[in-house]
Amino acid sequence: MNILSRALRRPKSPTPNGKKRINLALQGGGAHGAFTWGVLDELLNDERIEIEGMSGTSAGAVNAVMVADGLTRGGPEEARKRLSDFWRAASRDGDMSKLNRAISERLFSLIPIAVTPFQPWFDAMSRMLSPYDLNPLNINPLKDLIERFVDFEGLRADARPLFVAATNVQTGKLRVFTRENISAEAVMASACLPAIFRAVEIDGVPYWDGGYLGNPVLFPFFRATETEDVLIVQINPLERKTLPTSTREIVARANEITFNSSLQSELRAIEFVQRLIDQGRLPHGMGPSQYRYVRVHRIVLEGLGERFSG
């Protein structure tokens, strides 16, 4: 939490009550989504902070809608409770089929994927069969969990900006779902890993995981919110000090690079725009033809050594 502590020492985006207003951008695509839960629990418990807007992709989208739903229902404490209840339900063993268990582990495991008991079985099967073969009934435990925990009608009525990213399979373009059109299907689309699930269709358009094109998306914040501070909760490491040599390690690292590429591009664009503002080549301000400074902070999942979990 050191990066956040440094950002809070000199609040530049205060609310009338003196709190630090931030936008939260929650990454997905990794095996450690519960790390984000822990970070969010601390942030929601910090009375210095107020969340203005949220963006999430894949598991990050799931966490974002859980927080948004809790804030709408009863504030930070309710958001903490809903996160806790959801993650405990997602990790509960229960009476699941082998397929359901493997899918749940792949999406929500509280421990690295490489050591979950059904993952080797599922990996082997998914190399031979597509989700249309392996999962003919289109079973998706995520859908049941999302619908059980989130009041989407109430969420759509809330004023807090919310953005969920998905990938249009046919056009290869990014789709950002906003608060006004958020739904369980939109969250499922954002978390639709194509090796596991059939594409999620919304209004006849098929979608896959949003991590391919926006993990997470930052640009919607710049017009929809006032704060200039964006806090990214990042679970895919940008750098590795060791060279992957096994098949599992190579696949894991390739996935990390793939699911970080869009974030890298957005961060470069932010830096470029701010350099042009400093040079006086772009107008600075909040107007429709003006550009803003953005202060980006990151909390990164580290300390797991150089072990890969694919």
For each feature predicted by the language model, list its residue ranges.
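Patatin-like phospholipase
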Residues: 6, 19-25, 30-134, 140, ...
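Acidic, Ser/Thr-rich peripheral helices and adjacent loops at domain boundaries
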Residues: 244-277
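Active-site-adjacent alpha/beta core region of enzyme catalytic domains
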Residues: 23, 100-233, 238-242, 286-310
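A short, acidic, amphipathic alpha-helical segment used as a generic capping/interface helix at domain edges
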Residues: 277-288
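Acidic-glycine-rich active-site phosphate/pyrophosphate-binding loop
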Residues: 11-14, 34, 192-193
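Small-residue-rich anion-binding loops in enzyme active sites
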Residues: 1-25, 160, 169-170
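Structural motif
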Residues: 14-17, 46, 222, 291
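Hydrophobic alpha-helical membrane context
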Residues: 70-72, 221, 241, 254
